[in-house]
Amino acid sequence: MAGNAVDNANHLTYFFGNITREEAEDYLVQGGMTDGLYLLRQSRNYLGGFALSVAHNRKAHHYTIERELNGTYAISGGRAHASPADLCHYHSQEPEGLVCLLKKPFNRPPGVQPKTGPFEDLKENLIREYVKQTWNLQGQALEQAIISQKPQLEKLIATTAHEKMPWFHGNISRDESEQTVLIGSKTNGKFLIRARDNNGSFALCLLHEGKVLHYRIDRDKTGKLSIPEGKKFDTLWQLVEHYSYKPDGLLRVLTVPCQKIGVQMGHPGSSNAHPVTWSPGGIISRIKSYSFPKPGHKKPPPPQGSRPESTVSFNPYEPTGGAWGPDRGLQREALPMDTEVYESPYADPEEIRPKEVYLDRKLLTLEDNELGSGNFGTVKKGYYQMKKVVKTVAVKILKNEANDPALKDELLAEANVMQQLDNPYIVRMIGICEAESWMLVMEMAAWGPLNKYLQQNRHIKDKNIIELVHQVSMGMKYLEESNFVHRDLAARNVLLVTQHYAKISDFGLSKALRADENYYKAQTHGKWPVKWYAPECINYFKFSSKSDVWSFGVLMWEAFSYGQKPYRGMKGSEVTAMLEKGERMGCPPGCPREMYDLMFLCWTYDVENRPGFAAVELRLRNYYYDVVN
């Protein structure tokens, strides 16, 4: 996404940010216009792209650097590079399509920072408001949504931001647009944009000498927008920004946005809003007033018998439904927040959380087929009738014939932990039923365990795996902050709601730590998953969030190995001996080096030097943003 790519270039002394071509040329003139003098700037046409401005023979030459789908950067027809800096370094040795070698960077003058683009000015506020009002989220649920889905949200906001702009009038007719432009002031350059059809095309209506001119804005097969034979842009607001600086094929520059009838320009929430003064040279840069629809409740869940809550159709990398709408552009991509398990079922104020964790068996319906089984018994799909909705649930059913009090105690202990947890990346408990068997009723994650899913879907790309393990790190960071130790973190205990949404499950071994504790000491060695355990767990029976970090490193190895078993063919004692010698599992084939480095860091022998989940999540987050953008 544009924002992150720009953030990654801000450290370059020769990066000037969102300056115009003319401003770039002025800087090169200041530098003497010597052959090979160059600077880097943000592309004003392409999201996430850059432009290279080079002096040669006393003239400035400009090259667009586009960000490819795989995250690399290239000048059209040239070779791909990992970053704009790498591209510049390469062209300092090989001209390959440029007028000359890049010889000397023109650095920003002292005290000058890269110029912020119009979208960066609005982005953070737009994202926050969009998430608040689309999903009616608040507090931690809001923050978690923004952190985990920021790349997708940035792209979404960037491509739909025009809908918040005063100059966008949606699906009105040509006649209506003319009438609207002619109302009020007759300032030359007054303009609006309207949607033309369902194929994603628009029309620019521009007032010049009392007449309304119409320019068609077409969308090509790659999704780029342009007036006929004009420059191409990724978004409408980039197109408007460009033509507010120069006519470039229009009869004149865009000056004053024609507002929708009944819309007052000013600051949001201001009852006596003062009109904003508009002038050529960057309309978007001064747009600080945009109005969102009033917050509303989420659409009501479907009735019993309609689509399941964890539908398999969610995919944040592909559009859902029809491609283009008259008012919407590309349909919004589905995200974890669209599922019914992102928030607690009790987030709805009308769904009153019961004082007791025990549920009424008559309100629970079970399907016959098993989702899974284990030493404890079986897991079945079910439906629980809440006050307002029927909730699709997973039900862990204790073996009845065993009548083992220890199994019952384990189930109740797990329920005791789960009832205290509420996070989008942790499977929540709905309650317990005591009937023909003891039952633990939980949120449904229909796609099943992460390890099995990856074993069966080896086509899943790295960025999808990184997305999922980042979500797990967010859930574990929440556990760490809540003073809980999981003690059984493994890919088999991460369940998928969709291909792009993971939740941590199986809290049977989990322990709550007192405020004055930072570890739990087990009294005896149990049936432990030793291959996932840190040395201090095996040697001293000590468990902490730091030992969960070790397990998380093993989980990452499982994920990037597409569900392979760690330390395959080795006994627990052999694994322990291997770790004591300082040896670790090797990097899975094809795994990004940055991800293996993080695994290795998680496997730091000394618990004091091992990072906590706050550091692990942040490192994963930054890498995830980088590869997805």
UniProtKB/Swiss-Prot annotation:
Question: What does the record say about PTM?
Answer: Autophosphorylated. Phosphorylated on tyrosine residues by LYN following receptors engagement. Phosphorylation on Tyr-317 creates a binding site for CBL, an adapter protein that serves as a negative regulator of BCR-stimulated calcium ion signaling. Phosphorylation at Tyr-342 creates a binding site for VAV1. Phosphorylation on Tyr-342 and Tyr-346 enhances the phosphorylation and activation of phospholipase C-gamma and the early phase of calcium ion mobilization via a phosphoinositide 3-kinase-independent pathway. Phosphorylated on tyrosine residues in response to IL15.
> Could you tell me which residue ranges the Protein kinase domain spans?
365-625
Q: Where is the active site?
A: 488 (proton acceptor)
Modified positions (Phosphotyrosine) in chain numbering: 27, 46, 130, 290, 317, 342, 346, 358, 478, 501, 519-520, 540, 623-625
Sites where the protein binds ATP: 371-379, 396
Q: Supply one GO CC term from the record.
A: plasma membrane
- Know the name of this protein? Tyrosine-protein kinase SYK
Q: Which organism is it from?
A: Rattus norvegicus (Rat)
